[in-house]
Amino acid sequence: MTSAPTLFDVPQPVPPFKTQLLKWIGNKQRFAHEIASYFPDDVGTYFEPFLGSGAVLGTYAPRKGLGSDALKPLSEIWATLSHDAEELKQWYSARRSLVDADFSNKEEVYEKVKASYNNSPNGADLLYISRSCYGGVVRFRQADHFLSTPCGVHKPIPVESFNRRVDIWSERVKGAVFAHLDYRDAMQEARKGDLVYCDPPYTDTQAILYGAQKFVLGDLFAEIERCKSRGVRVALSIDGTKKSGLKEIIHAAPEGLFETEVMVNCGRSMLRRFQMGGATLESEVVADRLLLTY
């Protein structure tokens, strides 16, 4: 495996796009353009099977793409953005408009929306929760998938600001379609000349948060190997050096599966900050690895 310079040391053909639609754990919006700079120039269809906040897809703005996620309400948000952006605006407006001008009932509104979601999981409630919860950490209990994240300390963005973001994003993702799929089913659709970008839920601490879905890294490596055998290029973002207390997590990829490795400096760990109750994290620095099969 060859080691490339850090993403910050190379020219960036993909311009930055810093406008977030969703607040979501693991969001790579700040440096998504640097990740996309390592994508091939001749991509057929772009696949992103762990869509999350859609930061990389939105930044890359593929001519043709499939964005998918195992969390159905999240997939509903993206599908609605694609086929009816005005409805997405209405989802947010209907909930945000319940908040008083002085924000005195902000937490009450949030808890009401959260209760509605837990009673019947849906994209409309999840959209507001993602913009309003603490740190963008949409946390689920593994036992019953109950969404348990508390209300954030920040003020949810105004309806007008959110609507502008929807307009910007709907234009950037117009080449993509969105679906509720297991990552394996999505990756099996990729063909020679296509590109799959994977940003799976982090193991260790984050695995218990993201949609409460079970995830085995070895299974993903096996699917990547099958993609590579068909001529599909795969780019994988994964923990390179993540400090959780005194523990340092380093994953070793199967020999020969990846041909290029890039270290990405992601700054402070948002997840760890949430767990430490807002404490500053001078030693909690995350360095992702970007692994490429090409």
Per-range role (PLM):
Residues 1-66, 70, 181-195, 203-294:
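Class I S-adenosyl-L-methionine
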Residues 8-9, 24-29, 138-142, 154-161, ...:
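A broad, low-specificity signal for short, low-complexity segments enriched in glycine/proline
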Residues 63-174:
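Class I S-adenosyl-L-methionine-dependent methyltransferase module
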Residues 131-132, 199-202:
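Short loop/turn segments at strand-loop or loop-helix junctions that form parts
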Residues 140-155, 201-219:
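Mobile active-site "lid"/loop adjacent to the S-adenosyl-L-methionine
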